[in-house]
Structure formats: C-alpha cells, structure tokens
C-alpha cells in the first residue's frame, strides 16, 4: 500500500507545473489582457519563431524605445512585460517550454491553478474511464487471489511431503501423515504422488492440487459481468418467456392428446350400446313383418 501511495505521489509531482511554467503562463495572460488580440511573444517582437538571440536582442532594443514610459506613459505595463518576454526567449529551457505550449496550447487559470481546457471529458467518457479502471483493478485482484490460492495449495503439498517420514499408518498405496504440532492430517499416495487433506470426523479426503484452482477468465471480471447484468435485466425477460411458451404449448398438446384418448375410450365404451340398440330395432321390425304376413293369408282364404 505504501508503494502505491509513493507512486501516486511521484505521479502527481511529475504532473505539477514548474516555476518557469507558471511564470510563462502569467506573462501570456498579462499580455492577452493588455493587447486583447492574443499576440505571441514573437509577434510582439516582430521576429520569426526560429529567430536567434541576436535577432531577439535587436528587436528588443527597438521595442523598448517604442514602449518606453517616458515616450508613452500608457505602455508602462507592456514595457515591463517586454523585459520578461525577452528573458524567457533568451533562456534555452524556458524558450523550449514556451514553444511547446505555443504549439500544444496554453492552460487556463481555473480558480486555484492552471488547467488544460482543450479537452473536457463528458459524463460518458468519465464513466467509461472509471469502468475500465475498475475492470482492470478487479482483474488484478482476481489474478492475485488465484495465485495466492495456488501458493496455499503448494504449501500444503510441500508440508505433507516433508513430513512423509512421520507417516503413522497406510491405506494401501496412501500413507497417512500427521504434521507434528499441527491439526491437519494428510494422505500421500506413493504411486501417483497426490496429496489429500483427511477429515478424521467424516473420513473424507480432499484433493490438494494447484491445478484445481480455476484460472482467471474474462467472464469472471467486472468488464464482462456488469454489461451482462445490464443486458439480462433489460432483455432477459423476453429470452425467458420463449421456453415457458414452448412448455405451455407442450402442456396444451398433452391435454389435447389426453382429451382425444378419453374421447376414444368413451366412444369405444359407448359403441356396444349403439350396436345393441340397432340389433333390438332390427328384431322389432322382423317381428312386425312376421305378424303382418299371416294376417294377409287368412284374409285371402276367406274370400
């Protein structure tokens, strides 16, 4: 933790402006407030950006005569700034810094210090940046936790193998090892070399292997889980309804099949009664016809 704090402190120191930078910013702001046309140091002296020191001194003599307070009392502030500007351009380091800010842009005064205003990230950019930083930190924590668990597993294996000579008994190819002064009981397989932790109460062995620790995947990180959580809460309902609807249709189909089978059974049970009714009706017709025929013969004989 202390190392991280020191790194952040050094990073903040590197980002801080130097005294020469602050002096350049003050002179630039003062020049803009006086001239109102955002003139550069080179434009004020009327020299090119690659002018030599001799050319700068020559231009300074001309401008100092022009803006001298004795000749022009209103240009007293500009005359003092002219001396500061020439001193900045005469020094190689301060001139490089001025040329750098002239090319990339000068920071603006924001209450307590000079801050860059060329790019102001919006809320979306800030949230994306925070999301990426949190994802990276979460990934690093998962990797550290995985390595720590593997190290713990390896430590158990080393302890069991170091004290293998203290084995009290054996189970076939496995030797039971109890560390002196320790509470854990290990079993070491003399053939495969596997080390297990033995629970004496339940007599269950738990395999100790660094390979059993799952490796860190992208799907385990915050970078994957948060978008998945949002998408699932937003659109998961529609995906969840599809299987339910199919189950409903299946259940409806089963109900229809059951109803059909019931109707078939009912029809099979009801069909004999219909046959019996038709047979009875046929017998009645036969009786009627049989009764009618003798009557007609008797009447013919009498005639």
Curated annotation (Swiss-Prot):
Source organism of this protein record: Schizosaccharomyces pombe (strain 972 / ATCC 24843) (Fission yeast)
Lumenal side: 17-123
Domain annotation J: ranges: 40-102
Alphabetical list of Pfam families matching this protein: DnaJ (PF00226)
BP GO annotations: protein folding in endoplasmic reticulum
Subcellular location: Endoplasmic reticulum membrane
Record's protein name: Uncharacterized J domain-containing protein C2E1P5.03
PANTHER family: DNAJ HOMOLOG SUBFAMILY C MEMBER 1 (PTHR44653:SF2)
Keyword Transmembrane part of the UniProt annotation: yes
């Amino acid at each position: 933790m202390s190392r991280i704090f020191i790194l952040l402190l050094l990073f903040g120191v590197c980002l801080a402006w130097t005294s020469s930078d602050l002096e350049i910013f003050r002179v630039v702001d003062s020049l803009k407030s006086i001239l109102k046309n955002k003139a550069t140091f080179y434009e004020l002296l009327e020299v090119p950006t690659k002018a030599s020191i001799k050319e700068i001194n020559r231009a300074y003599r001309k401008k100092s005569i022009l803006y001298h307070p004795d000749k022009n009392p209103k240009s007293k502030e500009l005359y003092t700034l002219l001396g500061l500007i020439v001193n900045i351009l005469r020094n190689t380091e301060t001139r490089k810094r001025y040329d750098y800010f002239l090319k990339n842009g000068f920071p603006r005064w924001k209450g307590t210090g000079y801050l860059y205003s060329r790019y102001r990230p919006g809320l979306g950019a800030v949230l994306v940046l925070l999301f990426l930083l949190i994802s990276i930190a979460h990934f690093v924590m998962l990797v550290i936790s995985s390595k720590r668990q593997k190290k713990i597993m390896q430590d158990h294996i080393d302890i069991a193998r170091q004290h293998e000579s203290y084995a009290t008994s054996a189970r076939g190819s496995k030797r039971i090892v109890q560390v002196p002064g320790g509470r854990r009981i290990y079993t070491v397989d003399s053939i495969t070399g596997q080390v297990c932790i033995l629970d004496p109460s339940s007599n269950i062995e738990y395999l100790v292997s660094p390979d059993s620790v799952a490796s860190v995947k992208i799907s385990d990180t915050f970078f994957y889980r948060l978008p998945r959580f949002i998408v699932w809460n937003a659109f998961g309902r529609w995906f969840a309804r599809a299987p339910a609807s199919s189950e409903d249709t299946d259940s409806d189909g089963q109900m229809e099949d059951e109803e059909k089978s019931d109707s078939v059974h009912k029809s099979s049970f009801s069909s004999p009664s219909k046959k019996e009714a038709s047979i009875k009706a046929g017998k009645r017709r036969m009786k009627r016809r049989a009764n009618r025929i003798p009557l007609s013969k008797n009447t013919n004989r009498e005639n």
